[in-house]
Amino acid sequence: MEIFGIIDYVVGWAVVAGIYAIFSLGLNVHWGYTGLFNIGVAGFFAIGAYTSALLTTSSPTPALFEDFKFGGDLPNRLGSFNAGIDLWFLIALIGAAITAGIMAALIGLLTIRLREDYLAITTLGVAETIRLIFHNEKWLANGSRGLYNIPKFLGDAVDLSLIHIS
């Protein structure tokens, strides 16, 4: 196994660990400072993740995935406006934050007067409903087959084929 494959593997795990660290910080702020256990954070995390993925993936070929309707394809739509800085990634993050924030505000308005156990039960139901929607609705997120071909941020910044020359 090449050293660059190992480094790529470690970096991938570090990114996943960073994402879950941010998730746990959000849960800690809510549960730690207010004492209210809110499992709905996982659902809003999923909404943000799927929104950013849906904005950046390209639409699949209809012959294979006829039910899947979305695919923003931001990297190709921005084209030269991208300016070499992966502007699509920033737009996808902003879109994900806005979408998750709007959904969290709507659910928050419905659950604002609930206390402790009832809030935990309600937000568990919300998070599970969101998970099941993304898992089962083929038109939204390709159902149980999941999303694929999600572009990497700064994915082609380094040409690894040139590393073998040195």
Which ranges hold each PLM region?
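Transmembrane alpha-helices and adjacent helix-loop boundaries
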Residues: M1-S166
